[in-house]
Each structure stands twice: as C-alpha cells, then as structure tokens.
C-alpha cells in the first residue's frame, strides 16, 4: 500500500457531512477505503458523574481528544492498524470496548471540527466543508438526537440555542476558509459529489504511480 489519501469532510451539526462522507465511502468501496468519525474521539469522561457529563459542551474543540485522533491518523498513514474508541452518546462516555481499523488506501475523516486543528488539517489531501442553511441543520439535528440518541425535544432545542448555535458561529463556520471544496446542500449535491470523487480518484492514482516509481 502506498501513501493513503486522506479526505476531511467538515461542516456544522446536521449539515449533511455524514451523508457526504458515506456517499464517498460507497463510491470507493471497490478500492481500499475506511472512514473515521471525529465523534468517536470525544474525551473519556469516566472521572465525571453522569450529571457532570451531561453539562459538557460537546460542540467546543476542547471536547475532543485530538491528540489521540492525530496519533491514530498518523499510524494509519504509516500502514499501521489502530484501536478506535467507541463513544456512547446516551451515557456521554466511551465504551470499554474498541474497534480495530486497518490501514487503507483512502481514509475519510468526518467531523464538525476536523478543520479547526491545524495539525490534523495539514495531513489532509482534500479538505471539504459541507455548507447548509441553519434552519435545515437544526431540523435534522432534532430528528437525529431524538431518534438516535434518546434525547427529548426540549433538551435538543435548548442545547441548540445555548450551545450549538454559538459554537457553530465561533468555531465551526470560520473553518470554512480552510476548505478546498465547499459543498452546498450536502449529500443532495450530486454534481459536487461526482467532481469530488473524480478528484480523489486522480490523487489516489498519482500516489500509486509515485509509489511504483520509487
């Protein structure tokens, strides 16, 4: 295996970045591809009570263990397998078990704040920002948090107004300037997805040719 292609897919909560990342994953399944979610790298909170964990600001950069994420990305790019954490959103903490991720030719990194950390950003071959209207994002977040994370409507709306929206404006939206590609309307933008897939394929081919010549 040559040097992997690392694609970063960022964007606000509910922007459709996960849909974009999964679509790219689907398109490259014939090649060697893996996906890493930044959400898996929320910090371990075993030392906190359940009440204290619930008060954590999960939309702030400090909520993530970027040192571990960086180390794991570097290991994957060096051809080494990693043990990826598994995060349980219902108890706001990591699960005891981990999942092994093997090195692949294409690595898709997905998360709202992956472009905020310069160390991680500099590893990427292509930086993508999924840009979606705030009204659409909050509607998607409400559905997701209620159906997938066991939250109440009141708690989701309160968190959005007090935490999610301010953090988006302060930390997530500004990272758009680092993006090589900005995709409006997320996974529904077929033209952007097709162009991005073609570009990734070209980079992968170039890296494979370089490796063969070395």
UniProtKB/Swiss-Prot annotation:
The keyword Cytoplasm applies. GO terms for biological process: CTP salvage; UMP salvage. ATP binds at residues 11-18. Keywords: ATP-binding, Cytoplasm, Kinase, Nucleotide-binding, Transferase. Gene3D superfamilies: P-loop containing nucleotide triphosphate hydrolases. It holds the Pfam family PRK. GO terms for molecular function: ATP binding; cytidine kinase activity; uridine kinase activity. Transmembrane segments: none annotated. GO terms for cellular component: cytoplasm. SUPFAM superfamilies: P-loop containing nucleoside triphosphate hydrolases. Its EC number is 2.7.1.48. Signal peptide: none annotated. It catalyses: uridine + ATP = UMP + ADP + H(+); cytidine + ATP = CMP + ADP + H(+). It is found in: Cytoplasm. Pathway: Pyrimidine metabolism; CTP biosynthesis via salvage pathway; CTP from cytidine: step 1/3; Pyrimidine metabolism; UMP biosynthesis via salvage pathway; UMP from uridine: step 1/1. PANTHER family: URIDINE KINASE. Belongs to the uridine kinase family. This is Uridine kinase. It comes from Brevibacillus brevis (strain 47 / JCM 6285 / NBRC 100599). The lineage of its organism: Bacteria, Bacillati, Bacillota, Bacilli, Bacillales. The gene is udk.
